[in-house]
Swiss-Prot record:
Its main location: membrane. The chain crosses the membrane at residues 82-102. This is Putative uncharacterized protein YLR294C. It comes from the Eukaryota. It comes from Saccharomyces cerevisiae (strain ATCC 204508 / S288c) (Baker's yeast). Keywords: Membrane, Transmembrane, Transmembrane helix. One of its GO terms (cellular component) is membrane. Partially overlaps ATP14. It is a single-pass membrane protein. It is found in: Membrane. GO terms for biological process: cellular respiration.
């Protein structure tokens, strides 16, 4: 299958998730984590997992807590900066949305 030029590029808002300050706020419990696995985008509610350094490993080891996410035009991604990666490009192609993942190094403060 040949890829055509995307008709529409979807804007992503990327924010660091659950800083120490946010952890003490009630609204932090409603944050979500997103992860791409086998061409499927899954959503993880932060209230169902432990907030710790190995967040990514925790998510991948608990597939029973995954829920399919219907794609929307704008998706907020809450990424733990200690994981050192960014989800960047969200493309529209053949009436389907595809998520392209690019790894990048983040500067840990």
């Amino acid at each position: 299958m040949m890829l055509r030029k995307p008709k529409k590029v979807i804007e992503l808002f990327i924010a660091s998730s659950l800083s120490k300050k946010k952890q003490t706020e009630p609204q932090a419990e409603q944050d979500h984590y997103f992860w791409l696995s086998s061409s499927h985008l899954f959503i993880f509610e932060s209230s169902t997992i432990k907030k710790k350094q190995n967040t990514l490993r925790t998510l991948c080891n608990q597939p029973h807590k995954m829920q399919n996410l219907f794609f929307k035009q704008k998706i907020q991604l809450y990424i733990d900066t200690s994981l050192s990666f960014l989800l960047l490009l969200f493309f529209y192609f053949n009436n389907y949305y595809f998520l392209s993942m690019t790894y990048a190094s983040l500067v840990n403060k």
